[in-house]
C-alpha cells in the first residue's frame, strides 16, 4: 500500500474564511475548486432543480469565503425581496404597492447604509455639531453594494409591472447569489437573467471558446498588467507624491487609469466568461472606455451595468429630462453625486462623482448650444481631440478617486504643474522600463481596433480543447513567473 499524505492545513483552508485572503477568480484555490465544480455541474445538466440548488449553495460558499458569516445578509435580502415582490404582484392599490416597494428600498438601502455609511454619516454629523465621533468597528461585507442594487432592480421592475415575480424562492436565490457576478458585478437585471435559469443547459462551441478567451483576457489584464504596475509603480507615487517629480506623478496617474481599468474590466471579463461556460449570457460591462470622445460617451462605455442602473432607477425617477433643461442638469449632478457615494463612504468619492456630474451637465449644455443631436459622433481630428480631452479629464478625476486624503490630491497636482521636468523621463524609463512596457502594451491593446480583438477571439474559439488548455496553462505559468507578491484583491471588492 502507498502511504497517503494529506495536508490537513490546506484542506482546512478550503472550508474556513480568512479575512486576509478572500476568494477571488485569479487565486489558485478558486481555479482548483472551479474545476471540481464544473465536473458536478456537467453531471447535473439534465436535473434542473438539483443543478440550481448546487450552484446556489456553491455561490453561498463563495460568498462565505469572501465575507465570512455575513452571507446571512445575502439571505435576508433574498427572502425579503422575494416575498415583497409576491405581495406587490397580488396588490392592486397604488399606495399599498408604493408602501411595499418603499419597504424593499428600506431593507436594502438600510443594510447598505448601516454597514457602509454609519461611520461616515456619524463623522459628518459630529463635525457639523462641533463634536467628536468615535468610529464604530463595522465590517463591510464584500459586494454589498452590488447584490443590494441587483435585488432592488427586481422589486422595482415588479412594482413598475415590467416583469412578473418568480414563484420559486430557489430560483430567486440563484439570481441574487450567482457567484460569477456576486461580489463585484456586473449588476445583472432580472429581466435579462431570470428567463435563462430554467432553460436547458447548452454551451455551444462559440460560447465555450469565447468564455475561455474572456477568462484568459481578464486574468492577463488583472494579474499581469494591473497588479504589476500597481505594486511596482502606482502605489509608490500615490502614497508620497511630493517625493517624486511632476513627470513621475503624471505617469503615476496614467498608470492608475490603466490599473483600475484592467483590474475592474478584467474581473468583468472573467465573470462574463465563467457565466458563458455555465451556459449564461451577461451583457457587456466595459467597451474600451478611454476611446470616448466625450464624458457622456465615457459613461456609455465604463461600468455599463452601474451607469445604466443609475439612469433607469435614479435619474429617470428624479425626472430625467422631462422637467426642463435646468432640472435635467441638476438630476445629472445628483445622480453622479450619489453614484460617487455608492463607491464609498468618503468625501473623495463624493468629489469624484460630483466632478463627473458637472461634466455631464456641461456636455449637455454644449450639445444644446452647438445643436448636435444625441449620439452624434465626431470624426477625424475632432474625435482625436475629444478623446485626448476626455481621457485627461477622467485621469484628473481618478486622482481624487484614488486619494482618500484631499491634500494628497492637491500635492500630486502641484507636483505635476510646478515640477514637470520632461528631461527626467529617460532616467525614469531606465528605472521603470518593465512597468512602462506593460503600460504601453495595456494602452495599445485598449486602443486597438475592435476587429483585432474579435479576430483573436475567433482564433481561440477555433482551437481544439487541447489548444485552449495549453493557452490556459501558459498564462497561469506567466502569472506565477511575474508574481512578486500575493495576487491583489480586485479594487471594486471594497465597494
Which residue stretches match the model-derived regions?
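Membrane-embedded transmembrane alpha-helical bundles that form the catalytic cores
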Residues: 2-494
Amino acid at each position: 500500500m502507498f502511504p497517503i499524505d494529506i495536508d490537513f492545513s490546506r484542506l482546512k483552508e478550503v472550508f474556513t474564511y480568512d479575512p486576509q485572503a478572500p476568494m477571488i477568480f485569479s487565486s489558485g484555490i478558486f481555479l482548483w475548486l472551479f474545476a471540481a465544480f464544473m465536473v458536478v455541474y456537467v453531471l447535473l445538466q439534465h436535473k434542473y432543480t438539483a443543478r440550481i440548488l448546487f450552484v446556489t449553495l456553491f455561490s453561498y460558499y463563495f460568498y462565505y469565503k469572501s465575507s465570512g458569516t455575513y452571507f446571512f445578509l445575502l439571505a435576508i435580502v433574498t427572502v425579503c425581496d422575494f416575498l415583497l415582490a409576491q405581495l406587490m404582484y397580488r396588490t392592486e392599490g397604488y399606495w399599498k404597492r408604493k408602501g411595499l416597494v418603499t419597504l424593499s428600498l428600506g431593507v436594502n438601502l438600510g443594510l447598505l447604509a448601516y454597514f457602509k455609511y454609519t461611520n461616515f454619516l456619524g463623522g459628518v454629523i459630529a463635525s457639523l455639531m462641533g463634536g467628536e465621533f468615535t468610529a464604530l468597528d463595522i465590517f463591510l461585507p464584500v459586494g454589498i453594494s452590488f447584490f443590494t442594487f441587483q435585488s432592488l432592480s427586481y422589486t422595482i421592475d415588479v412594482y413598475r409591472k415590467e416583469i412578473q415575480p418568480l414563484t420559486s424562492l430557489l430560483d430567486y436565490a440563484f439570481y441574487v447569489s450567482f457567484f460569477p457576478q456576486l461580489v463585484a458585478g456586473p449588476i445583472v437585471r432580472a429581466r435579462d437573467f431570470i428567463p435563462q435559469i430554467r432553460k436547458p443547459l447548452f454551451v455551444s462551441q462559440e460560447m465555450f471558446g469565447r468564455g475561455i478567451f474572456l477568462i484568459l483576457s481578464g486574468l492577463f489584464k488583472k494579474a499581469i498588467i494591473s497588479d504589476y504596475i500597481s505594486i511596482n509603480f502606482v502605489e509608490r507615487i500615490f502614497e508620497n507624491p511630493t517625493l517624486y517629480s511632476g513627470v513621475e506623478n503624471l505617469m503615476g496617474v496614467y498608470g492608475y487609469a490603466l490599473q483600475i481599468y484592467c483590474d475592474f474590466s478584467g474581473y468583468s471579463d472573467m465573470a462574463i466568461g465563467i457565466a458563458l461556460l455555465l451556459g449564461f449570457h451577461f451583457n457587456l460591462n466595459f467597451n474600451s472606455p478611454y476611446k470616448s470622445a466625450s464624458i457622456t460617451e465615457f459613461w456609455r462605455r465604463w461600468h455599463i451595468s452601474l451607469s445604466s442602473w443609475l439612469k433607469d432607477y435614479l435619474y429617470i425617477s428624479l425626472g430625467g429630462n422631462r422637467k426642463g433643461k435646468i432640472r435635467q442638469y441638476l438630476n445629472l449632478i445628483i445622480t453622479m453625486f450619489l453614484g460617487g457615494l455608492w463607491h464609498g463612504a468618503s468625501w473623495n468619492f463624493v468629489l469624484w462623482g460630483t466632478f463627473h456630474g458637472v461634466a455631464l451637465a456641461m456636455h449637455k449644455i454644449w450639445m444644446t448650444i452647438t445643436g448636435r443631436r444625441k449620439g452624434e459622433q465626431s470624426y477625424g481630428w475632432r474625435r482625436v481631440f475629444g478623446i485626448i480631452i476626455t481621457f485627461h479629464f477622467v485621469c484628473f478625476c481618478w486622482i481624487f478617486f484614488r486619494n482618500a486624503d484631499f491634500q494628497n490630491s492637491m500635492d500630486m497636482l502641484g507636483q505635476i504643474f510646478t515640477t514637470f521636468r520632461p528631461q527626467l523621463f529617460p532616467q525614469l524609463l531606465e528605472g521603470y522600463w518593465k512597468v512602462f512596457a506593460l503600460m504601453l502594451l495595456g494602452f495599445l491593446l485598449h486602443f486597438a481596433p475592435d476587429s483585432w480583438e474579435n479576430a483573436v477571439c475567433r482564433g481561440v474559439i477555433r482551437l481544439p480543447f487541447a489548444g485552449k488548455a495549453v493557452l490556459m496553462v501558459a498564462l497561469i505559468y506567466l502569472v506565477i513567473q511575474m508574481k512578486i507578491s500575493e495576487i491583489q484583491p480586485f479594487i471594486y471588492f471594497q465597494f
